[in-house]
């Protein structure tokens, strides 16, 4: 069985993330979405909320599993016999950082990293940008799945 992982914080998941996950799900038999736990960062959504949102928006693919992870991604991969990491690249600045990570990961464990160019529609998109625009009342309906838009609006009304 061909397996891959799409890692990230996904706070929240965007249409750009979803595009990469969707494309990976067509290339691999099983795709894990690994939601990073970073206790040093306070996210807008708790990890379990992010996992729930991702499960909802990836359910139609049928071969996507969503789990949290803490620590080294290569350890997550080793525990699940995952030989490949799939990463979307938006710009040259992404490539510089991701190449360093890919070289470290293959050196640590032999896990390969495959870079997927981002759909140009989403080349500017990040979770941080989505949160910033949403905080100030901007229209983000075209940037996130409807269930995420609803969750964001609800969360921002509370805060």
Predicted regions span which residues?
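Nucleotidyltransferase catalytic core that binds NTPs
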Residues: 1-159
